C-alpha cells in the first residue's frame, strides 16, 4: 500500500472547525472514494478496499467522526463522517483514474499494488514494488480524497461495488 500523492504545499483534509456532523455526506467539502478492480474476487476486493482506506485515514486529517456511545455507554469508534463510496472499475480504468488523481495537487491518493496481495512479508512487498517500473505495476484499489467536484470528474459514473 502506498501513498502516492501527498502534496507538501496543499494539505488535503478537514480542519477541526470544518467537521460538522449535522451535514449530509453530499454537503461535505471533500469527497472520499475507493475504487476497486472489478476483476477481483469478493474477498480480495474487500481486502484491497480496506488496505487502501488504512493509509488514507492515517494521512488525511478529519475523515473520522467522534466516537459514539450507545445507550449502555459502550463506545463505538468513530466512522467516516463524510462517507466513503466503494466503487468498481476494470483494471485499465482504475489505472487511468489513479493517473488523473495523481496529477491533481488538491487530491490525496493511496493505492494498493497487486504485489500487496501476492506477498506475505512486507519487505517482500517493498522489494516487489521497488523493482517494478511504475508503468508495469497493476493495482487492486485506489483511494482518493479531494474536492467533491474534482473527485467526481476523476471517477465519472462508476458503479458501487456489488
Residue spans for each PLM region:
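Positively charged, small/polar-rich N-terminal and surface patches that mediate targeting and assembly
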Residues: 2-162
Amino acid at each position: 500500500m502506498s501513498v502516492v500523492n501527498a502534496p507538501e504545499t496543499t494539505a488535503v483534509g478537514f480542519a477541526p472547525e470544518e467537521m460538522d456532523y449535522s451535514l449530509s455526506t453530499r454537503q461535505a467539502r471533500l469527497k472520499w472514494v475507493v475504487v476497486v478492480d472489478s476483476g477481483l474476487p469478493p474477498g480480495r476486493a474487500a481486502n484491497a478496499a480496506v488496505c487502501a482506506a488504512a493509509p488514507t485515514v492515517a494521512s488525511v486529517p478529519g475523515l473520522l467522526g467522534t466516537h459514539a456511545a450507545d445507550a449502555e455507554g459502550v463506545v463505538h469508534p468513530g466512522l467516516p463522517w463524510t462517507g466513503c463510496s466503494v466503487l468498481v472499475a476494470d483494471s485499465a480504468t482504475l489505472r487511468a483514474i489513479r493517473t488523473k488523481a495523481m496529477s491533481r495537487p488538491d487530491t490525496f491518493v493511496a493505492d494498493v499494488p497487486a504485489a500487496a496481495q501476492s506477498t506475505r512479508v512486507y519487505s517482500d512487498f517493498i522489494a516487489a514494488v521497488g523493482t517494478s517500473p511504475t508503468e508495469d505495476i497493476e493495482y487492486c484499489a485506489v483511494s482518493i480524497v479531494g474536492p467533491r467536484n474534482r473527485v467526481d470528474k476523476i471517477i465519472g459514473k462508476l458503479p458501487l461495488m456489488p
